[in-house]
Amino acid sequence: MRFAIAYYKNNLAGRNIIEQFKKLFFSPQIPIIELNKETIYSDDIDEKNYPELKNIDFLIFASTHKSKKGEPSLSLHSAGNWRSADLGGKPGKICRTSAFVLKYLFQKLEENAKNNKEIYEKYNITLEATHHGPFINIPNCFIELGSQENEWRDEKAAEVIAETISSLQNFDKKNYNWTPCIAIGGTHYCPNFNKIQLNSNYAISHIIPQYNFPVIEIMIKEAEEKTIENIENVLIDWKGCGKSEDRQKVLDLLEKTGLKYERTDRTEK
């Protein structure tokens, strides 16, 4: 797969990840874009402003992860805003992404972390729900190191992420017969979807968490249209949809749109 990496030059984790990537896997065939502003506000990323992105299939943003709890984490997620644009991007607009690339990267992130006992015991490897900017046309995702300065400077953790990014050189979607889907419900860190992304045949692209409820039709349409693969299936975190009436509204919408659904608690994982 032809991919590129982008990072903000003043972002500690992004810079650390890129340094490890260059040490281990640097290739002139993989463009590395150094941004002069934070990734989430870089809506100007396109072939016109960055000619090296011509013929690129996918863009990976390497960045910091921040959280109130400050737990060490290696995380992966799609970009976009289901509602307001408090952290870059556009309100109600999400980016294009690939369910297959996200599944592949998440499995590799888990695998590479497991190869380093210290990292695997310290860091939480997790998906995140779709959130924040930028809003660009190139299919993309974020891979992040967090959640505090000690972690942002952790070279071993950054190396795990660099290895994961590099593995995309060997990715060919023709080799996989996964079922692409979007996911609805649950918390921001998606424990039920994590298990499915790792262990089932489902490949998740965009995630609409419970805190972005109520789900409306345009959100589902956005998720469908902004997934490279053809979406016919939706995963539902059954207990992560609030009250029964909230869940029923989701089911009614899916029936209206003609999408099939599967409950996470009834999915092999």
Task: For the regions a language model picked out, list residue spans one by one.
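N-terminal catalytic or cofactor-binding beta/alpha core of small enzyme domains
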Residues: 1-137, 148, 155-159, 166-191, ...
